[in-house]
């Protein structure tokens, strides 16, 4: 005999919400789906160029581990001072 009540509840009119407004309805196991990007505001579909992440992975790594451009410029100056003292 098969088990009853093992499947999640199905919502045939689930709302997809992007930036606080309902952009479409679809079927889902959740009543509301919150998304950051959808086809209506994605640069590929709209034909516009938009920078979503202003700080790249390398910049975040440099900032996190203290290897930013300010630190590297200071270390170069210190190295030049040491070389001039020799």
Swiss-Prot record:
Protein name as catalogued: Large ribosomal subunit protein bL31
Family that this chain belongs to: Belongs to the bacterial ribosomal protein bL31 family. Type A subfamily.
Highest taxon of the lineage: Bacteria
Biological processes annotated in GO: translation
Gene: rpmE
Single GO molecular function: structural constituent of ribosome
InterPro entries: Ribosomal_bL28/bL31-like_sf, Ribosomal_bL31, Ribosomal_bL31_A, Ribosomal_bL31_sf
UniProt xrefs under SUPFAM superfamilies: L28p-like
KW Iron-sulfur (keyword) present: no
């Amino acid at each position: 005999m098969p088990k009853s009540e093992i499947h999640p509840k199905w919502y045939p009119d689930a709302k997809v919400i992007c930036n606080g407004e309902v952009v479409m309805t679809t079927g889902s196991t959740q009543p509301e789906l919150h998304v950051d990007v959808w086809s209506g505001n994605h640069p590929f579909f709209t034909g516009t160029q938009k920078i979503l992440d202003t700080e790249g992975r390398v910049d975040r790594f440099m900032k996190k581990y203290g290897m930013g451009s300010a630190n590297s410029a200071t270390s170069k100056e210190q190295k030049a001072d040491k070389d001039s003292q020799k």
